[in-house]
Amino acid sequence: MPAIEFAVFPASEAFLKDEKVLYPAVDWVSKADGYIKSYYGIQSEDKKTLYLALFWDTYEHHKTLMESKEYAELIGLLKPSIGGKVDMQHVVFSDDATTVLTAPTTEIAIIKKKEGHSVESVKSAIHNLSTAVDKDNVSYVPSVYGPTVEDAETFLLAIGWDSVEAHTKAVETGADVKGLVGTLRSCTNISYVHVPFKVYSPVA
């Protein structure tokens, strides 16, 4: 599976007025060795946090770019879109994330292991929840998950939904899903957001 870079930061006022200010940066990175494709979107909850999801052949391809002297040029191109601190994480998901990122909205959950629990127990709980969600939420299977490169005890889970409301309803009305969410919360700390991603098309 590809390595996916998630870069998350407050969007600048310039981006919120015109998302095209981001295009020069993504167009530049789209020519980098190992780049596959990218998606971007504003978080539904706060209407101002920008999420970039860039697919790479491997994590090492992006690492090589970040360590190159050309990387400063990319940062310069990104600056007009950035309105605050940038948080970056990398993950190799359990399956192809294309379907969940092209859903009308994507749930991005950050799941951190609690003290006293094993990574394997967390992974098992996430797998069971993911499997249960996919049985009912068939339009956007498979949901995907994986540990971050930066911290093996932190997992990202991505699920595609028709809407934020559809996600809420699935948890409230699905007995299996509700129980499995409870099991996962017993061994982890979970935070999540929803992002309607768009695929980036290189400028002609």
Q: Where are the predicted features?
A:
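Short S/T/G/P-rich N-terminal loop/turn motif that feeds into the first structured element of a domain
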Residues: 1-204
